[in-house]
Regions:
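Cleavable N-terminal export/targeting peptides
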Residues: 1-44
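Short glycine/proline- and aromatic-enriched beta-strand/turn motifs that initiate or cap beta-hairpins
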Residues: 31-84, 246
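A generic hydrophobic-segment detector
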Residues: 33, 160-173, 187-192, 205
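Outer-membrane beta-barrel proteins
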Residues: 33-41, 96-98, 144-150, 166, ...
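Predominantly the C-terminal beta-signal and adjacent terminal strand-loop region
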Residues: 37, 185-187, 195-246
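Gram-negative (and chloroplast) outer-membrane scaffold detector with strong preference
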Residues: 44-48, 56, 60, 91-170, ...
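Residues that define the transmembrane beta-barrel architecture of outer-membrane proteins
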Residues: 46-50, 82-86, 134-140, 154, ...
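Flexible, solvent-exposed loop segments that connect beta-strands
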Residues: 64-79, 111-135, 168-183, 218-232
Length: 246
């Protein structure tokens, strides 16, 4: 048995070493292409650019308690927890000048899940529970992009703009939902971000980090829902790290 476990550990170690070697080889090969002179020299002068974007997000709700929360002694704690999700988008970039671009995402899907944690006290016994709010959001962001001068095969940029979100799975219209926290379908957010362009021979690789802050109250409050009536306003917050290939 010990020999089998030892062989398994050796096998896993060999696999990790092989994967690491492949990753190092690929990364060194890619970055060597960045040092071979200007790639895609006419890329930035084209009127339009198109790309595919995939991202990873961390999101949570910023909320305020309703006065009824202080009047009750059963629900003693309400918290919003960070959770992860993914983004898939199609990028359309319109050149406005040497340093400015208008960026649109005609198709931008965000898959996320928000979690509320509750602490309830009944007859001296405290219980903890979670309420999850899953969403598939169709977003319509509009960003103004300001770029630095290109240095060989590298460029840095910042973005700022607005985004409208439409939740395809909103539960605001559901009835008899004692266990639900009802959320409205639409939200309007402001966004800022920072990104980097790496120019390769046949494509541009763009990592980007972006912050989103919702402006509208998402909470569709219902006096009859005990997990909802202790909350007043709910605003969305999200940070996204994404990779775009143009």
């Amino acid at each position: 048995m010990q020999n089998i476990e030892f062989r398994d550990k050796q096998y896993l170690l060999r696999r990790k070493i092989i994967v690491l070697c492949i990753a190092v080889f690929c990364s060194s090969n890619l970055f060597s292409q960045l040092r071979q002179g200007p790639n895609l020299p006419d890329h930035d002068t084209k009127p339009y650019h198109f790309g595919i974007n995939i991202g990873f997000n961390k999101s949570h709700f910023l909320f305020s308690h309703h006065p009824i929360f202080l009047q009750r002694d059963t629900i003693t704690v309400v918290e919003s927890v960070n959770n992860s999700g993914i983004n898939l988008a199609w990028l359309v970039d319109k050149r406005l000048g040497n340093h400015f671009n208008l960026r649109l995402h005609p198709l931008d899907l965000t898959f996320s899940e928000k979690i509320f944690q509750y602490s309830e006290n009944y007859s001296g016994d405290t219980t903890f529970l979670e309420k999850k709010v899953s969403s598939i959001t169709l977003a319509f962001p509009v960003h103004l992009k300001f770029s630095s001068d290109r240095i060989n095969n590298f460029k840095v940029y910042t973005i700022a703009g607005f985004k409208y979100d439409y939740d395809l799975t909103s539960n605001a219209g559901k009835k008899n939902a004692e266990e639900l926290i009802k959320l409205k379908k639409g939200d309007f957010s402001v966004e800022v971000g920072l990104g980097f362009h790496f120019y390769f021979p046949v494509f541009v690789l763009t990592p980007e980090i972006k912050l989103s802050s919702g402006l509208l109250n998402l909470h569709s409050r219902d006096e009859n829902l005990r997990y909802s009536n202790v909350i007043d306003k709910i605003n969305s917050k999200m940070i996204t790290f994404s990779i775009t290939v143009e």
